[in-house]
Amino acid sequence: MSESSTFTTAVVPEGEGVAPMAETVQYYNSYSDASIASCAFVDSGKDKIDKTKLVTYTSRLAASPAYQKVVGVGLKTAAGSIVPYVRLDMDNTGKGIHFNATKLSDSSAKLAAVLKTTVSMTEAQRTQLYMEYIKGIENRSAQFIWDWWRTGKAPA
């Protein structure tokens, strides 16, 4: 595993009486190192992902170049909504291309696994690379994506 740096930032939600959530930010040298770390983070508590229950997660952020495209995997709730556990995001304000992960057994525990080299890219370069990554998971099952991201290697 390549070296990574870790930072914790407090994210304070709006509203009274709500405890702040902390997001751990870690920097990785490669896409596969970041994806492996993200999946390991999701499974790092007492609960583990049952990949047979995974569904694809589609971006709902209209400002994203990946709007309405598959960007990750999650689980469907009883109410029918999809909770993402690992998704690939892009940020032009400091995190570049990164995986967002939520621990399955503690939804307040969050990880941003940043692809270090993408932070200093121009917005155009970053967007192009991000869309190449998104194209790579297009038309793939949630199980395929999970196995790829969990191991760092696309299933045969």
UniProtKB/Swiss-Prot annotation:
<dbReference type="GO" id="GO:0000287">
    <property type="term" value="F:magnesium ion binding"/>
</dbReference>
<keyword id="KW-0325">Glycoprotein</keyword>
<keyword id="KW-0926">Vacuole</keyword>
<feature type="signal peptide">
    <location>
        <begin position="1"/>
        <end position="21"/>
    </location>
</feature>
<keyword id="KW-0479">Metal-binding</keyword>
<dbReference type="GO" id="GO:0005775">
    <property type="term" value="C:vacuolar lumen"/>
</dbReference>
<keyword id="KW-0456">Lyase</keyword>
<feature type="glycosylation site" description="N-linked (GlcNAc...) asparagine">
    <location>
        <position position="139"/>
    </location>
</feature>
<keyword id="KW-0732">Signal</keyword>
<dbReference type="GO" id="GO:0004521">
    <property type="term" value="F:RNA endonuclease activity"/>
</dbReference>
<comment type="similarity">
    <text>Belongs to the ribotoxin-like family.</text>
</comment>
<dbReference type="GO" id="GO:0033902">
    <property type="term" value="F:rRNA endonuclease activity"/>
</dbReference>
<keyword id="KW-0378">Hydrolase</keyword>
<comment type="function">
    <text>Fungal ribonuclease involved in fungal defense. Highly specific and highly toxic fungal endonuclease that cleaves a single phosphodiester bond in the 28S RNA of eukaryotic ribosomes at a universally conserved GAGA tetraloop of the sarcin-ricin loop (SRL). The damage of the SRL inhibits the binding of translation elongation factors and halts protein biosynthesis, ultimately resulting in the death of the target cells. Shows antitumor activity.</text>
</comment>
<comment type="subunit">
    <text>Monomer.</text>
</comment>
<dbReference type="GO" id="GO:0016829">
    <property type="term" value="F:lyase activity"/>
</dbReference>
<keyword id="KW-0460">Magnesium</keyword>
<feature type="glycosylation site" description="N-linked (GlcNAc...) asparagine">
    <location>
        <position position="100"/>
    </location>
</feature>
<feature type="active site">
    <location>
        <position position="98"/>
    </location>
</feature>
<keyword id="KW-0540">Nuclease</keyword>
<protein>
    <recommendedName>
        <fullName>Ribonuclease ageritin</fullName>
        <ecNumber>4.6.1.23</ecNumber>
    </recommendedName>
</protein>
<dbReference type="GO" id="GO:0031640">
    <property type="term" value="P:killing of cells of another organism"/>
</dbReference>
